[in-house]
């Protein structure tokens, strides 16, 4: 998983509330588990027209927002069914951060596990970012995870993130990789635990 320490890029506004995972990644793209080619499926029904041509009215197809690194999203982004493909697709599309007010819980967890930062801000800060994101001349920002700051051409906005989430994103590690760094302690605990309670390791007797 890629590390996240300080990243600069364009931010695209997608402020509609309750954008769910079916909008982010339609069901026809959920067949594979190899995480390949999912960038095509992201917002497919909005990015493309019926004939397959790019929709010129969709924000991520417009000049100045086509390669957005960050999305400024509406409340409850990522609601709906739990489908990690939605996060995989966003990551493959080049999205490294989502900034909004609230995120669906499981979707938020999936973002962390896959190296996408989610930042929750208050409404005044979001309104100021929305003004900047609306223009291709001012939609560049820098997000520092070390300082927990978003820097624009006009101001620096601080955000709050749990220390565990920040450390895992900065290290580029998911929950398994993060846990494995404590493997010696886990193994020592296991030895001590079963030495005090050896009956717990005995095979179960068959029921007759």
From Swiss-Prot:
<keyword id="KW-0100">Branched-chain amino acid biosynthesis</keyword>
<comment type="similarity">
    <text>Belongs to the LeuD family. LeuD type 1 subfamily.</text>
</comment>
<comment type="pathway">
    <text>Amino-acid biosynthesis; L-leucine biosynthesis; L-leucine from 3-methyl-2-oxobutanoate: step 2/4.</text>
</comment>
<dbReference type="GO" id="GO:0003861">
    <property type="term" value="F:3-isopropylmalate dehydratase activity"/>
</dbReference>
<dbReference type="InterPro" id="IPR033940">
    <property type="entry name" value="IPMI_Swivel"/>
</dbReference>
<dbReference type="InterPro" id="IPR000573">
    <property type="entry name" value="AconitaseA/IPMdHydase_ssu_swvl"/>
</dbReference>
<dbReference type="GO" id="GO:0009098">
    <property type="term" value="P:L-leucine biosynthetic process"/>
</dbReference>
<keyword id="KW-0432">Leucine biosynthesis</keyword>
<keyword id="KW-0028">Amino-acid biosynthesis</keyword>
<comment type="subunit">
    <text>Heterodimer of LeuC and LeuD.</text>
</comment>
<keyword id="KW-0456">Lyase</keyword>
<dbReference type="Pfam" id="PF00694">
    <property type="entry name" value="Aconitase_C"/>
</dbReference>
<dbReference type="GO" id="GO:0009316">
    <property type="term" value="C:3-isopropylmalate dehydratase complex"/>
</dbReference>
<dbReference type="InterPro" id="IPR015928">
    <property type="entry name" value="Aconitase/3IPM_dehydase_swvl"/>
</dbReference>
<dbReference type="InterPro" id="IPR004431">
    <property type="entry name" value="3-IsopropMal_deHydase_ssu"/>
</dbReference>
<comment type="function">
    <text>Catalyzes the isomerization between 2-isopropylmalate and 3-isopropylmalate, via the formation of 2-isopropylmaleate.</text>
</comment>
<protein>
    <recommendedName>
        <fullName>3-isopropylmalate dehydratase small subunit 2</fullName>
        <ecNumber>4.2.1.33</ecNumber>
    </recommendedName>
</protein>
<dbReference type="InterPro" id="IPR050075">
    <property type="entry name" value="LeuD"/>
</dbReference>
């Amino acid at each position: 998983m890629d590390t996240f320490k300080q990243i600069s890029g364009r931010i695209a506004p997608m402020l509609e509330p309750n954008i769910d995972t079916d909008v982010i990644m339609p069901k026809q793209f959920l067949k594979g588990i190899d995480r390949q080619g999912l960038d095509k499926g992201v917002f497919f029904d909005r990015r493309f027209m019926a004939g397959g041509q790019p929709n010129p009215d969709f924000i991520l197809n417009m000049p100045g927002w086509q390669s957005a690194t960050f999305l400024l999203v509406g409340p409850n982004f990522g609601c709906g069914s739990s489908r990690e493909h939605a996060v995989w697709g966003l990551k493959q599309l080049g999205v490294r951060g989502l900034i909004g007010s609230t995120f669906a819980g499981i979707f938020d967890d999936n973002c962390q596990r896959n190296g996408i930062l989610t930042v929750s801000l208050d409404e005044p800060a979001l309104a100021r970012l929305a003004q900047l994101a609306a223009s291709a001349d001012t939609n560049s920002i820098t997000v520092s995870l070390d300082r927990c700051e978003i820097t624009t051409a006009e101001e620096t906005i601080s955000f709050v993130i749990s220390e565990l989430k920040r450390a895992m994103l900065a290290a580029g590690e998911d929950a398994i990789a993060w846990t494995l760094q404590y493997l010696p302690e886990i193994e020592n605990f296991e030895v001590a635990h079963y030495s005090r309670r050896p009956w717990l390791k005995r095979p179960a007797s068959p029921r007759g």
